[in-house]
């Protein structure tokens, strides 16, 4: 069976995912993308990914699955229309879901259209554990994001920090996951994913650190409850095309697509 998969956005993550799908002969796919600029199409995908004109064009193409990888604004603009039309979605920009009103609208649209919403793990691990403790009022979750200067170069000047002279680690934020995800839409989707899987946007605590000595994009997750403790530390290689995101993210999205299409899954 050939699956029809449409991307919203065709940046670093979506391009890597598209290339992975096209290379998988065991799971043939037809691909399309809704993108603001046709020049975004990498040469390796030219002629292999159809370019769509706006949400009407995407709906007319009739995909089996829509993969959003364009940022939080794209969710506000396109997700509700896709879900109402009955199109299953994978949402990569999970930070948008920190907005309770938007998340409620999307869930209502999915119910009306008979569609499903999936959020990939992305750069992190341990979501199954967080889901297991989600209902406990006595659970504590702390997440630390520690990234090198390259991941924050565009934002640091606005915080009064010179990225070229920063010599020591600096805490940029400490607080609830909701505020972290909405304040840093390009860097903290992970915070929203953890909170949605676990104990919620308010109780999940987030520490954001820029560290000139950081080895890759580092993620530390600590969970404590009477059920036990979990500590995970990941050191992910940054994406070659976008240092704000981990290279692992595209592979996580690809794995989520394969699970969505599979008859047999684990986890």
UniProtKB/Swiss-Prot annotation:
Pathway: Cofactor biosynthesis; NAD(+) biosynthesis; iminoaspartate from L-aspartate (dehydrogenase route): step 1/1. GO terms for biological process: NAD biosynthetic process. NAD(+) binds at residues 123, 189. Specifically catalyzes the NAD or NADP-dependent dehydrogenation of L-aspartate to iminoaspartate. Its EC number is 1.4.1.21. It comes from Bordetella pertussis (strain Tohama I / ATCC BAA-589 / NCTC 13251). This is L-aspartate dehydrogenase 2. The lineage of its organism: Bacteria, Pseudomonadati, Pseudomonadota, Betaproteobacteria, Burkholderiales. It holds the Pfam family Asp_DH_C. It is an enzyme of class 1 (oxidoreductase). InterPro entries: Asp/hSer_DH_NAD-bd, Asp_DH, Asp_DH_prok, L-Asp_DH, NAD(P)-bd_dom_sf. It catalyses: L-aspartate + NADP(+) + H2O = oxaloacetate + NH4(+) + NADPH + H(+); L-aspartate + NAD(+) + H2O = oxaloacetate + NH4(+) + NADH + H(+). Keywords: NAD, NADP, Oxidoreductase, Pyridine nucleotide biosynthesis.
């Amino acid at each position: 069976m050939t699956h029809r998969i449409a991307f919203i956005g065709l940046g670093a993550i979506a391009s890597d995912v598209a290339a992975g799908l096209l290379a998988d002969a065991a799971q043939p796919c037809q691909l399309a993308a809704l993108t603001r600029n046709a020049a975004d199409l990498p040469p390796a995908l030219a002629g292999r990914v159809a370019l769509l004109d706006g949400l009407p064009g995407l709906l007319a193409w009739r995909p089996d699955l829509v993969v959003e990888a364009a940022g939080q604004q794209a969710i506000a603009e396109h997700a509700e229309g896709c879900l109402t039309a009955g199109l299953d979605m994978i949402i990569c920009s999970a930070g948008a879901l920190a907005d309770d009103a938007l998340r409620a609208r999307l869930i209502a649209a999915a119910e009306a259209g008979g569609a499903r919403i999936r959020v990939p793990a992305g750069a992190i691990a341990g979501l199954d554990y967080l889901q297991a403790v989600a209902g406990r009022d006595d659970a504590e979750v702390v997440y630390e994001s520690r990234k090198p200067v390259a991941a924050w170069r565009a934002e640091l000047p606005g915080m009064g920090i010179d990225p070229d002279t920063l010599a020591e680690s600096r805490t940029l934020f400490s607080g609830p996951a909701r505020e972290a995800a909405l304040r840093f839409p390009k860097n903290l989707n992970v915070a929203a994913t953890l909170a949605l899987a676990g104990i919620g946007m308010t109780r999940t605590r987030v520490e954001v650190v820029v560290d000139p000595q950081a080895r890759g994009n580092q993620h530390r997750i600590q969970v404590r409850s009477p059920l036990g403790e979990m500590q995970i530390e990941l050191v992910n290689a940054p994406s070659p095309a976008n240092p704000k995101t981990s290279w692992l993210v595209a592979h996580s999205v690809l794995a989520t697509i394969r699970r969505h299409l599979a008859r047999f899954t684990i986890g």
